[in-house]
Amino acid sequence: MVAQGGMAPRLMTADSRPEDDADATLRPQRLADFVGQAQARANLEVFIQAARARGEALDHVLFVGPPGLGKTTLAQIMAREMGVGFRSTSGPVIAKAGDLAAILTNLEERDVLFIDEIHRLAPQVEEILYPAMEDYELDLVIGEGPAARSVKISLPKFTLVGATTRSGLLTTPLRDRFGIPVRLVFYTLEELEYIVTRGARLLGIGIVPEGAREIARRARGTPRIAGRLLRRVRDFAQFAGAEAIDRAIADRALMALDVDAMGLDTMDRRYLTVIAQHYGGGPVGVETLAAALSEPRDAIEEIVEPYLVQQGFVQRTPRGRMLTSGAFRHLGLAEPQRPPSALPLFDEGD
């Protein structure tokens, strides 16, 4: 998760917010109830059942993928399916080695420890984690100077589940200690439609298929956003005295929330409009864009751009960001004629 600095809270960001935990009943409780991620789900079922049959702790698992796709939920389900305890923390919270040692020494046999944003662990904390993952022991130095001594503390055999949105920031030694890497992908429209329909039932509001599809197609392939949009559309439906959410109510509610038919919000359109009108569609450097939008560079790169790149509205090139023809069509603007030297030679990559 990015520290958003001056960026105002956005309905369409997939980063977790307290309100997302308010309706815990929307989260699936078992692997069989989890929708989407078919390959990951099938593989996890094999690993869980095999570990249970042997009476062993599950091997360490690393979830990689954009925010909001179910990494935390899957970790909780794994603990529930294994019949063991679940502890949760995040990389930035573990400030020093002693913090991690306190967590690890309080685990029971085969417990699941979930560390979100594991790529943000401090180096000195990460070094403590290596022997804990590999040998199930802590190697601590007690005291200072000539009186310092090394103490080994045995740990119960536990399962570490790490989650990261930026696997490239993980060190190789840490990445190599995860026996089960799992990459999560964006959800299909049909999967999100099912999730929205199920969520509406659990929230006690009726919904017709067209209404569920309208919410699903604006949810950016992300269940967390779908659930957030559903709760807001429910408010509009109840305010209007409607017994069920149909397409018209969903469309009216989402347009009132500045979420357009492609799932773009005000910030997305502002980003595209600045490039189109101020820089002729690009190329323009990300630092220049950050200054023009008065937003931090990391917020632009990690929060605003990924969905726009995924939808084919923006290209990241060696010369900077460029809008595609689809972006101009979506904005209803004429595409300028670019000289050949302005065209991208290849994608810059993430």
From Swiss-Prot:
Q: Which domain of life is it from?
A: Bacteria
Q: Into which EC class is this enzyme placed?
A: hydrolase
UniProt-annotated binding residues for ATP: 26-27, 68, 71-73, 134-136, 177, 187, 224
Per the record, which residues fall in region Large ATPase domain (RuvB-L)?
Answer: 4-187
GO BP field = DNA recombination; DNA repair
Binding of Mg(2+): at which residues?
72
Q: Which GO terms describe its cellular component?
A: cytoplasm; Holliday junction resolvase complex
Q: What is its EC number?
A: 3.6.4.-
Sorted UniProt keywords = ATP-binding, Cytoplasm, DNA damage, DNA recombination, DNA repair, DNA-binding, Hydrolase, Nucleotide-binding
Q: Where is this region: Head domain (RuvB-H)?
A: 261-350
Molecular function (GO) terms listed? ATP binding; ATP hydrolysis activity; four-way junction DNA binding; four-way junction helicase activity
Q: Region (Small ATPAse domain (RuvB-S)): which ranges?
A: 188-258
Q: Which NCBIfam families match?
A: PRK00080.1, ruvB
Q: How does it assemble?
A: Homohexamer. Forms an RuvA(8)-RuvB(12)-Holliday junction (HJ) complex. HJ DNA is sandwiched between 2 RuvA tetramers; dsDNA enters through RuvA and exits via RuvB. An RuvB hexamer assembles on each DNA strand where it exits the tetramer. Each RuvB hexamer is contacted by two RuvA subunits (via domain III) on 2 adjacent RuvB subunits; this complex drives branch migration. In the full resolvosome a probable DNA-RuvA(4)-RuvB(12)-RuvC(2) complex forms which resolves the HJ.
The protein's matches in PANTHER family, at most eight in alphabetical order, are given as: HOLLIDAY JUNCTION BRANCH MIGRATION COMPLEX SUBUNIT RUVB, PTHR42848
The identity of this protein, by name, is Holliday junction branch migration complex subunit RuvB
Question: What gene, per UniProt, encodes this protein?
Answer: ruvB
